[in-house]
């Protein structure tokens, strides 16, 4: 039985998600699989790639051949280099940052100075650098000038 590591498409129209699976080469793309070894979400920015490295290494060692797309993902995660025998394979996939329950969000994720309940929010009239309605050209009808 020829076994392949390939992508199984799931998701909605124009919102694809893929599972990296081990399947018989004769089955359909989205057909029965032997084992799921990872996930790939190309729509997210940056793309999400997660591969169960020990299981992928096992299937590669017993002769499973990856498709071109699966091979590209295995190279990104460093699993292909590890299978080929490189000593220090490097993964070019960033690990997702998780925020634990007790910790606060990173500084880049925090909102700047929250507005208190009694404070007024700034309006357009508070900004002198923005043009006002009275600065509109005079040849424009009044009903158009009043709209913003």
From Swiss-Prot:
Ribosomal protein as a keyword of this entry, yes or no, is yes
MF GO annotations:
structural constituent of ribosome
Residues making up the signal peptide according to the UniProt record: none
What Gene3D superfamilies is this protein classified in? 3.30.1320.10
Q: Which GO terms describe its cellular component?
A: cytoplasm; small ribosomal subunit
Tell me the InterPro entries matching this sequence: Ribosomal_bS16, Ribosomal_bS16_CS, Ribosomal_bS16_dom_sf
Which Pfam family is one of this chain's hits?
Ribosomal_S16
**What ranges does the record give for the region Disordered, renumbered to this chain?**
95-148
| GO BP: any one term | translation
Keyword annotations for this protein, in alphabetical order, are: Ribonucleoprotein, Ribosomal protein
Q: Which family does it belong to?
A: Belongs to the bacterial ribosomal protein bS16 family.
Q: Write the protein's name.
A: Small ribosomal subunit protein bS16
Query: From which organism does this entry originate?
Result: Tropheryma whipplei (strain TW08/27) (Whipple's bacillus)
Question: Could you read off the lineage of the organism from its UniProt record?
Answer: Bacteria, Bacillati, Actinomycetota, Actinomycetes, Micrococcales
């Amino acid at each position: 039985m020829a076994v392949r590591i390939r992508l199984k498409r799931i998701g909605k129209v124009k919102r694809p998600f893929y599972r990296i699976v081990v399947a018989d080469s004769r089955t359909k793309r989205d057909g029965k699989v032997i084992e799921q070894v990872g996930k790939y979400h190309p729509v997210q920015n940056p793309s999400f790639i997660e591969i169960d490295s020990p299981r992928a290494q096992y299937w590669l060692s017993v002769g499973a051949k990856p498709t071109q797309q699966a091979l590209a993902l295995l190279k990104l995660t460093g699993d292909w280099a590890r299978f080929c025998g490189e000593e220090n394979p490097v993964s070019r996939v960033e690990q997702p940052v998780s925020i634990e329950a007790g910790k606060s969000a990173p500084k880049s994720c925090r909102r700047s100075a929250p507005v208190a309940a009694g404070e007024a929010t700034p309006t357009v009239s508070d900004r002198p650098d923005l043009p006002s309605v009275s600065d509109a050209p005079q040849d424009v009808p009044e009903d158009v000038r009043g709209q913003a």
